[in-house]
């Protein structure tokens, strides 16, 4: 797959985000998700705790940061679903080779973007505020990100956590001040 095609696939994220989220949101009753609210809250809290601890380490190189971020992404995020969702309808028609190449490129871009912002975590803290269910598979864990240095104002954040039957909960999206990671 040529780089031009991969760039087009990235641009499709904006057009497919609404449809997929609507499917998740309206996928049924809230009973199952309600049973897993504490699991979703724990997932977000555990991720925040790990990020805070890692950000305080002074012995980390860029390579170390990327490796740790890769492990965190694998543990806490539904990377496969995010990757498929970011491509939208083109995922179904892509060959296995194209899917594999896109998944590698998507992960590379995701980790590089996260690594570029990693140093800013030292001054941030997460204050949980609310948790809501949307349908029977989606849980929104909300909170405020506070910048202890005072350089930036507080921002509202929602972690969109998917709770599928017989699967561990995983983060599917992060929404900061009503801007979705998947819409960006």
Question: Language-model segments: what does each one mean?
Answer:
Residues 91, 108-109, 147-148, 176-181:
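Solvent-exposed loop/turn segments at secondary-structure junctions
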Residues 154-183:
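Short beta-strand edge/turn micro-motifs at domain boundaries
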Residues 71, 78, 82, 133-135, ...:
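Intrinsically disordered, low-complexity linear regions
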Residues 31-35:
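Boundary at the C-terminal end of the N-terminal hydrophobic targeting segment
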Residues 112-155:
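Surface-exposed, charged secondary-structure patches
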Residues 36-116:
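Early exported N-terminus immediately downstream of N-terminal targeting peptides
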Residues 21-30:
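C-terminal segment of classical bacterial N-terminal signal peptides
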Residues 2-18:
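Bacterial N-terminal signal peptides that target proteins for export
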């Amino acid at each position: 797959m040529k780089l031009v095609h991969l760039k087009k696939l990235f641009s499709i994220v904006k057009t497919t985000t609404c449809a997929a989220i609507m499917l998740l949101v309206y996928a049924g009753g809230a009973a199952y998700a309600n049973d897993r609210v504490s699991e979703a809250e724990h997932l977000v809290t555990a991720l925040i705790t790990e990020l805070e601890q890692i950000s305080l380490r002074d012995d980390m190189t860029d390579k170390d940061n990327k490796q740790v971020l890769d492990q965190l992404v694998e543990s806490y995020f539904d990377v496969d679903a995010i990757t498929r969702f970011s491509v939208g309808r083109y995922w179904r028609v892509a060959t296995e080779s194209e899917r594999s190449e896109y998944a590698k490129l998507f992960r590379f871009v995701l980790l590089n973007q996260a690594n570029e912002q990693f140093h800013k975590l030292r001054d941030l803290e997460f204050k949980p505020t609310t948790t809501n269910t949307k349908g029977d598979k989606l849980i929104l864990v909300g909170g405020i990100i506070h910048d202890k240095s005072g350089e930036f104002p507080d921002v509202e954040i929602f972690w969109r956590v998917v709770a599928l039957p017989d699967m561990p909960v995983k983060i599917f999206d992060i929404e900061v001040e009503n801007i979705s990671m998947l819409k960006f």
